[in-house]
């Protein structure tokens, strides 16, 4: 064939149109993606592509030689029946549709029972709050397979109360080599470096990165459930560290499907509202549950009624007849004495305004606080420093809370083998879980792991 300028014009056979050409010609993908497409409920996110089904007024033209255009306004007003559109008409490759259909065909709820005896790996064990939290969960037995603890005082306590394998250092390579596989991993990683009362060094403190070794174990062992705990300030002042932990957990892949292995969620819970204990203790809880080719429906435990402080105090304690008795027998230390005086003044003011006797209340006051830290209805947050110093006093009884009372305010059993001093057990309780909160979370985790809602 010759062109108008006399030169031969090369001719070629028209290429066969492939599926990808048809997909590229679809109006669903040719139109630019504007913000309105993301707001419509008909927008579909699939395989990383944002797809918008074609409008009823759009007409898909299969030929590539003609331009796609909207029908003019002069077209017949009679509404046409909308034709059923196949997958290729939405601009999605057939392979993508097949993979998506296979994933959507998986059951959203599938019962995969946990073993009757759930083995537990305890990190940063301390007082073994994880062990005592799971003892009363109905329908399941929890057996601690190992614990990891570096503090010598805590190790002494653990050896007297848990007859299981113990490891000294989570950073020791022999730990990762020798630690057995478990169904459930739990750990309250060191909080001093993230606490509002500490130096707030975060991951710049060597203790701030110890959680990484727990995550390495999770990556290698792939337990069915993981529960982490730390102070609320982790979410407030160290949010980047919290995000890193969540990202690492979400990035762990299932070796069979190469998809994310865990459902991950976190929430701040208060022991007073979610543990039924009059103890104002807010903590961040991070939950991870193995998906095992199904969707996880985990529901955080809701608020429950709180018991009264009087129910947790020793019954043999005798209340003072008047605060004048306490004013004549003040504790040692200028700060402690000032806090007692201010607390008594506040209690008397409240009693006068409510028309009650001043000894009607059971106030608990922190003697070592620079500002008055007292409550008539609950225990202020127990920390390691306050627990070690036995700083919390029952004002109505004129003395510090006993070890048994502190155990009850953390929902621990009181029949433990206590082979350390009262100051040491108080400091350990300041670092411990509130057992009733952890128990309720674990119950929900087991239900979600088995596909029960």
Feature names for model-found ranges:
Residues 111-225, 232-240:
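Core alpha/beta nucleotide-donor-binding catalytic domains of modification enzymes
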Residues 127-128, 190-194, 232-233, 274, ...:
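Short, solvent-exposed loop/turn segments at secondary-structure junctions
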């Amino acid at each position: 064939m010759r062109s108008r300028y006399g030169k031969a014009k090369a001719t070629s056979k028209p290429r066969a149109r492939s599926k990808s050409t048809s997909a590229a010609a679809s109006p669903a993908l040719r139109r630019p993606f504007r913000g309105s497409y993301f707001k419509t409920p008909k927008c579909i996110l699939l395989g990383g592509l944002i797809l918008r089904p074609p409008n009823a007024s759009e007409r898909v033209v299969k030929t590539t030689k003609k331009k796609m255009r909207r029908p003019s306004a002069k077209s017949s007003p009679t509404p046409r029946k909308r034709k059923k559109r196949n997958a290729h008409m939405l601009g999605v490759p057939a392979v993508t549709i097949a993979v998506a259909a296979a994933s959507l065909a998986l059951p959203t709820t599938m019962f995969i029972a946990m073993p009757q005896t759930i083995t537990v790996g305890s990190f940063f064990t301390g007082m073994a709050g994880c062990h005592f939290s799971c003892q009363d969960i109905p329908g399941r037995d929890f057996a601690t397979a190992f614990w990891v603890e570096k503090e010598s005082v805590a190790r002494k306590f653990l050896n007297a109360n848990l007859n299981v394998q113990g490891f000294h250092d989570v950073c020791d390579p022999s730990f990762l080599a020798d630690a057995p596989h478990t169904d459930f991993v739990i750990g309250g990683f060191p909080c001093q470096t993230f606490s509002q009362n500490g130096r707030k060094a975060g991951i710049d403190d060597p203790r701030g990165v110890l959680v990484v070794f727990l995550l390495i174990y999770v990556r290698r062992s792939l337990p069915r459930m993981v529960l982490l705990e730390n102070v609320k300030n982790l979410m407030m002042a160290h949010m980047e560290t919290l995000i890193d932990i969540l990202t690492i957990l979400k990035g762990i892949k299932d070796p069979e499907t190469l998809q994310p292995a865990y459902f991950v969620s976190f929430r701040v819970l208060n022991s007073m509202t979610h543990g039924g204990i009059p103890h104002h203790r807010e903590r961040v809880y991070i939950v991870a549950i193995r998906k095992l080719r199904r969707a996880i429906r985990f529901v955080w435990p809701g608020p429950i009624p709180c018991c009264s402080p009087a129910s947790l105090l020793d019954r043999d304690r005798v209340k003072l007849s008047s605060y004048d008795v306490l004013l004549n027998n003040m504790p040692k230390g200028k700060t402690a004495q000032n806090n007692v005086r201010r607390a008594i003044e506040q209690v008397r003011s409240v009693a006068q305004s409510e028309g009650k006797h001043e000894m009607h209340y059971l106030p608990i006051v922190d003697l070592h606080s620079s500002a008055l830290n007292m409550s008539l209805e609950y225990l202020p947050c127990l920390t390691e420093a306050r627990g070690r110093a036995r700083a919390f006093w029952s004002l109505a009884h004129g003395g510090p809370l006993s070890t048994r009372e502190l155990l009850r305010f953390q929902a621990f059993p009181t029949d433990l083998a206590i082979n350390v001093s009262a100051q040491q057990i108080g400091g350990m309780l300041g670092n411990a879980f509130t057992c009733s909160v952890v128990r309720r979370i674990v119950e929900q985790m087991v239900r979600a792991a088995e596909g029960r809602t």
